[in-house]
Amino acid sequence: MSEMPKVRGRLTQARPLSDLTWLRVGGPADWLFQPADVEDLSDFLARLPEEVAVFPMGVGSNLIVRDGGLRCVVIRLGRGFNQIDISGTRVVAGAAALDAHVARKAADAGLDLTFLRTIPGSIGGAVRMNAGCYGSYTADVLVEVQVVSRTGEVTTLAARDLQLGYRHSTLAEGAVLTKAVFEAPRGDPETLHARMTDQLARRDATQPTKERSAGSTFRNPAGFSSTGRSDDVHDLKAWKVIDDAGMRGARRGGAQMSEMHSNFMVNTGRATAADLEGLGEEVRKKVYDSSGITLEWEIMRVGEKLSSD
């Protein structure tokens, strides 16, 4: 790979990534860059040879890095990008701010971003994937984002420019989202915190939160998140079609579809990325054979497989 530009942050060669993902799997990145701030990131990308690929990585909550690793520069934002500021009904959050922290701080100020409380990950990932639950989505409250392009240009994009859909945005490949601005509805702080406490209790009762998981494995075939309402039928939920295919609790190596929630894949202790991805593909095949439905991955899979996979 070409000679790397000088940086003020941290630039590490051949950095293993498994400890940076919630599933604790994956090979090394050629380089891992943790910029000090927006200027450091912009300058690095502007001087990085154009033939060098980059991969913006959040906190690794919805990600499988394959066992062969990534032949690129992985960019991971840290403390210089986790600020949360509130003015009136506007919440400005750095891309590295955790969704749960943003929800709690907004609630303290009497602002309702409670749907973010149980979403694993950081604001950058929430925007890029239009994360949502309980019938609310990031797109509902997003105003604009700050983005650093692959060529180092710092720009501001309106929410509409991202064309946010179900678990989808049109944010350019290699672009790094650094900050998001939300317009949040007002609410009573005590009521908002009580709602989040209830949401956490419901999540912990139905999802394997104490195991190594990456959140939902597949997108709902219905094309929307669970709302939690009594009229929200299950026929086109990913977990339901997985159950119908007999794949709840299915195993491959150290990977397992959770007994607690069949759309959650867990690392039982010694799974490889190949185990996890292979189990997911087996589930997809069984579901298709059972129902004719092709499940789409919600977990992102990146990198190279080992030759033995």
Curated annotation (Swiss-Prot):
Active site, UniProt feature: 167, 216 (proton donor), 298
Domain (FAD-binding PCMH-type): residue spans on this chain: 24-187
Keywords: Cell cycle, Cell division, Cell shape, Cell wall biogenesis/degradation, Cytoplasm, FAD, Flavoprotein, NADP, Oxidoreductase, Peptidoglycan synthesis
Pathway(s) where this gene product acts: Cell wall biogenesis; peptidoglycan biosynthesis
Similarity remark: Belongs to the MurB family.
Annotated segments matching region Disordered: 200-230
Pfam families xref list: FAD_binding_4 (PF01565), MurB_C (PF02873)
E.C. number: 1.3.1.98
Protein name: UDP-N-acetylenolpyruvoylglucosamine reductase
Residue ranges with Polar residues bias: 214-228
Necessary cofactors: FAD
Reactions catalysed, as given in the entry: UDP-N-acetyl-alpha-D-muramate + NADP(+) = UDP-N-acetyl-3-O-(1-carboxyvinyl)-alpha-D-glucosamine + NADPH + H(+)
Organism: Roseobacter denitrificans (strain ATCC 33942 / OCh 114)
Gene Ontology biological process terms, A to Z: cell division; cell wall organization; peptidoglycan biosynthetic process; regulation of cell shape
Cellular component per GO, a single term: cytosol
Secreted is among the record's keywords: no
Stated role: Cell wall formation.
Highest taxon above the source species: Bacteria
One example GO MF annotation: FAD binding
Record NCBIfam families: murB, PRK13905.1
Subcellular location: Cytoplasm
Start-end of Basic and acidic residues biased regions: 200-213
Gene label: murB
Primary localization: cytoplasm
